[in-house]
């Protein structure tokens, strides 16, 4: 019995989409991606679409002068990664994250947020 080409293509596309959805992508962050906040936050929180593997997931935050302001290793619980931040004053903060989901696929990304009236 032969499977028609359209059905086979649909099945392959469906499987590929399911596999891509299994990765841990950033769902939301606090402070929000691209936002401006009045004062430097004491903590950064990242929530992902899948649970994370704590030993292989990380985040690095640099302040307006380019120096790291993340305060040590992030705390990871389920799909949430949190790290304390050292205040570095007004300006643009850069966040770069790397996540390994429990399905062993890695993702990474970066974004900025602003402190003060910029």
Q: What is the meaning of each model-derived region?
A:
Residues 1-7:
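Bacterial N-terminal signal peptides that target proteins for export
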Residues 23-27, 33, 38, 106-118:
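Extracytoplasmic/periplasmic copper-protein system
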Residues 45-69:
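Short, surface-exposed alpha-helix to beta-strand junction/turn motifs within ectodomains of secreted
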Residues 72-77:
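Short beta-strand segments within Ig-like beta-sandwich modules, predominantly Fibronectin type-III
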Residues 89-95:
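A glycine-anchored, Pro-Gly-centered beta-turn/N-cap motif
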